[in-house]
Amino acid sequence: MEFSVKSGSPEKQRSACVVVGVFEPRRLSPVAEQLDKISDGYISSLLRRGDLEGKPGQMLLLHQVPGVLSERVLLVGCGKERELDERQYKQIINKTITTLNETGSMEAVCFLTELHVKGRDTYWKVRQAVETTKAGLYNFDQFKTNKAEPRRPLRKLVFNVPTRRELTIGEKAIAHGLAVAKGVRVCRDVANMPPNVCNPAYLASQARRLADSFDNITTKVIGEQEMAELGMNSYLAVARGSENEAMMAIIEYKGNADAKPIVLVGKGLTFDSGGISIKPAEGMDEMKYDMGGAASVLGTMHALAQLQLPINVIGVLAGCENMPGGNAYRPGDILTSMSGQTIEVLNTDAEGRLVLCDALTYVDRYDPETVIDVATLTGACIIALGHHTTGLLANHNPLAHELLNASEQAGDRAWRLPLFDEYQEQLESPFADMANIGGRPAGTITAAAFLSRFTKKYNWAHLDIAGTAWKSGKDKGSTGRPVPLLTQFLLNRAGVDIEEKE
């Protein structure tokens, strides 16, 4: 798919299709008015006849409109003009792309990026249009023998911007949008892989593949023998029940020789049966998505490398599998973590934190500027925030605010939960330094409280993506989140700010 920006009048476009908006009730957008004028009222007469009301997502495809050079005109319902917000804008773009892809229009000029979206500028509208387009056209069909493909799919999309001085902004928005979209695709492809393919070794191979693709990325992989030498006994305990060896991939991106690195740590449970504390059979197939954190770190590192940002970032993919084998760890076991702290296992299905605690201890050797871990950690986060919002907890207020700001900019929302000392009391154990669960109340917070005991030497944030990493039902599959949030955070850290864009 090829993207570009231009600035011009709709009536002068020679294209397979021109896309313009119509507001409710039957009100032409300024661009649609220009086409109506050149066609001697042809479009407005159709609206008066009741062919299109302008409700959000309504579509009307016109052929051979008088006076218009393009073969087709696609009228897109945008709802009430004053109520057009970012969520509705993305829904409209998605519906538009689906329609274009099915009409045989292999190229189109889209004027929807000229619509006024509350609180958003041209950069945001173009970038979101690119990201939404790529996400909408995504299809994971690698294991299907009969692949359904459009006969004449959309190949080229041009976004129109109001003035020529905004062309540079639009080009930057496309570059950023394509990088984020590629990162999202990498994340979704890896996460959607079946667990008989995507095991810890496969996850590590994808990290090596990334290093082969970019000169400023290197990857090393730590196996179980080296983990044992490092004292990563908590991580290794989770892996004991599986025939698949645990592997931790460390991806290093160097864009600034002098800066301390930002470290991203992704939970990579390529399949989580729950172990001895086994999960119910219903829905267990979706536990292949328990490596969504690692997949999102991999995708973010790809986006970062494509953007060539002048910062240093280390991505850690903590690959592992939690299975109920004869050598599996048990409820009641006491583990000595890499940090030296001891952990009483009360539930083997609270395994992600046992993997992450050793990974978070390991990354201290890089003297990090900031550490962010990403994990499908707790079902409690779904109860608290549902499937729309990622949970955020942090030991450093400025970092939390940075991430919240990036989440709003990227349209990949997060919400902060508290991390008060009182929650630590729920982790007390009579036999070890801590238990690996704190009971049902505040499950997301106590999981983060557990991790906070291993992150005292640096600024740290935790993203719980249990509710946002994948969808169930008819739209089942990885969402690619929070790649947009993390990439935006890195763009901001690299100094690519709003002033530069404007």
From Swiss-Prot:
- Domain of life assignment: Bacteria
Question: Which amino acid positions bind Mn(2+) 1, per UniProt?
Answer: D272, D349, E351
User: What InterPro entries has UniProt attached to this entry?
Assistant: Leucine_aapep/pepB, Macro_dom-like, Peptidase_M17_C, Peptidase_M17_leu_NH2_pept, Peptidase_M17_N
Query: EC no.?
Result: 3.4.11.1, 3.4.11.10
Query: Could you say which cofactors this protein requires?
Result: Mn(2+)
The cellular component terms of Gene Ontology attached to this UniProt record, alphabetical and capped at eight, are: cytoplasm
**What are the recorded Gene Ontology BP terms?**
proteolysis
What positions does UniProt annotate as the active site of this protein?
K279, R353
Keywords noted in UniProt:
Aminopeptidase, Cytoplasm, Hydrolase, Manganese, Metal-binding, Protease
Localization recorded for this chain is: Cytoplasm
What remark does the entry make about the cofactor? Answer: Binds 2 manganese ions per subunit.
Is the Transcription regulation keyword given for this protein?
A: no
- Write down the CDD domains for this protein, in alphabetical order: Peptidase_M17 (cd00433)
GO MF entry, a single one: manganese ion binding
Broadest EC class? hydrolase
Residues the record lists as binding Mn(2+) 2: K267, D272, D290, E351
Q: Which reaction does it catalyse?
A: Release of an N-terminal amino acid, Xaa-|-Yaa-, in which Xaa is preferably Leu, but may be other amino acids including Pro although not Arg or Lys, and Yaa may be Pro. Amino acid amides and methyl esters are also readily hydrolyzed, but rates on arylamides are exceedingly low; Release of an N-terminal amino acid, preferentially leucine, but not glutamic or aspartic acids
Q: Which HAMAP family match?
A: Cytosol_peptidase_M17
Purpose of the protein? Presumably involved in the processing and regular turnover of intracellular proteins. Catalyzes the removal of unsubstituted N-terminal amino acids from various peptides.
The similarity annotation says:
Belongs to the peptidase M17 family.
Q: What is this protein called?
A: Probable cytosol aminopeptidase
Q: Which organism is it from?
A: Aeromonas salmonicida (strain A449)
Read off the lineage from the record: Bacteria, Pseudomonadati, Pseudomonadota, Gammaproteobacteria, Aeromonadales
